[in-house]
Regions:
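Thiol-based oxidoreductase modules, predominantly thioredoxin-like and allied folds used
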Residues: 27-32, 52, 67-92, 101-104, ...
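Non-catalytic, surface beta->alpha helical segment in thiol-disulfide oxidoreductase systems
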Residues: 68, 102-141
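Local sequence-structure signature of Cys/Sec-based thiol-disulfide redox active-site neighborhoods
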Residues: 27-69
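Alpha-helical adaptor scaffolds
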Residues: 199-208, 220, 233-245, 250, ...
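Short solvent-exposed coil/turn linkers within tandem alpha-helical repeat scaffolds
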Residues: 71, 119-123, 153, 170, ...
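Register position in tetratricopeptide repeats
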Residues: 135, 139, 169, 208, ...
Length: 354
């Protein structure tokens, strides 16, 4: 995609002589199926960068708007064949299963033969993203690289932990757990802070393997062992999510209530509570108050407004839902997800009035 520059007619003659190249407006994404993209990569002998995303995912949108728009990221991305995969549509559903994509966004880096180099999970600022792109392109700080270094220096707890974490990132519990057990043994009193990190990774490994009961047990052990840790909030999020995934919404609601009690001014905690209530149909009166407060604290962030709109929608308050989502759209008018939300609310109102 290129930015077009318009100039006065009197400069047209000069422009015929002196023309500067157009500036790229972001990463160029290849169209086509996965097999077609891989065939192009193999022919060009280039690695592949695949952005696995969901349309509703806030960090995915931020990665697109901020990181992929960065000039240096854009320039270096030309060393890859780049493509985007919607994990909820078409072959994206199967590709997400094939590569064990369980967090969004996940940016997967593959060799031309289709084998994995490494992956990035979540939003990263442009400088960090760029550095890791360069590292992975050069085979540095990948799982293979860290594992080789760990084998040369097995007493280095940072290397051991990083290898374990990278296996968790790939949803490889069998490889991850023995390594994370070793981390726990190397830092039994958590003096270096690695024991609690390992416990968090163990919970995530079990979650990705589908053993939700084990994930909950590891999470609860963390909260009991490290109640004042800066990571406790995130672990409470995880425990609530695990209960929800297991179908125990009552237990999930209890954890979410603990979360907003412990962190009453945390926008993400409030938003998570309200979103859960909207989707589960539980505690909707309280969720309305909580979501309204989250909107105030976030200065009406579009994503938080969307949550409030969903709470109204769950209460059949369609006019309020429509008004709120329009407020979100005014702040982010190009967001397709918000447009879909408006259509959903308007259709529901029509059905209710028919």
């Amino acid at each position: 995609m290129f930015r077009r520059v318009f100039v006065p007619a009197c400069l047209a003659a000069l422009m015929m002589v002196l023309v500067s190249p157009p500036a790229t407006a972001g990463v160029i994404w290849e169209e086509g199926s996965f097999d077609e993209v891989m065939a192009r990569a193999k022919k060009a002998d280039k690695p592949v960068m695949i952005d696995f995303y969901a349309v509703w995912c806030g960090p995915c949108k931020l990665l697109e708007k901020k990181t992929y728009a960065d000039a240096q990221v854009t320039a270096f991305s030309n060393k890859f064949v780049n493509t985007k995969v919607d994990v909820e549509k078409g072959e994206g559903v199967e590709l997400a299963k094939r590569f064990r994509i369980m967090n969004y966004p996940t940016v997967l880096f593959l060799r031309p033969d289709g084998s994995e180099i490494d992956r990035l999970i979540g939003f990263l600022e442009p400088p960090e993203f760029l550095q890791l792109m360069k590292d992975y392109y050069n085979g540095v700080n990948t799982l293979d690289d860290y594992e080789a270094r760990m084998n040369e220096d097995p007493g280095n707890i940072e290397l051991v932990f990083t290898v374990g974490r990278k296996y968790v990132d790939r949803a490889d519990r069998e490889s991850a757990m023995p390594i994370l057990d070793k981390v726990m043994a190397m830092d039994p009193d958590n003096e270096k802070g690695y024991a609690e990190q390992a416990l968090m990774q163990m919970a995530d490994a079990e979650r990705k393997a589908g053993d939700i009961s084990a994930a909950i047990a590891f999470g609860e052990k963390f909260v009991e062992s490290y109640p004042e840790s800066e990571n406790t909030k995130g672990v409470l999020y995880d425990i609530a999510y695990y209960h929800k995934k297991a179908g125990d919404n009552e237990a999930a609601l209890g954890v979410y209530k603990d979360l907003i009690t412990k962190y009453p001014d945390d926008v993400n905690a409030l938003n998570s509570f309200a979103w859960f209530c909207a989707k589960s149909g539980m505690a909707l009166d309280l969720a309305t108050d909580i979501a309204q407060n989250a909107c105030k604290l976030s200065n009406d962030d579009p994503g938080i407004l969307d949550t409030l709109a969903e709470v109204y929608f769950a209460r059949d308050m369609y006019d309020d839902a429509i008004e709120t989502i329009k407020k979100a759209m005014a702040k982010d008018p190009e967001d397709d997800y918000l447009k879909e939300q408006l259509s959903k609310f308007e259709e529901a109102k029509k059905l209710a009035e028919s």
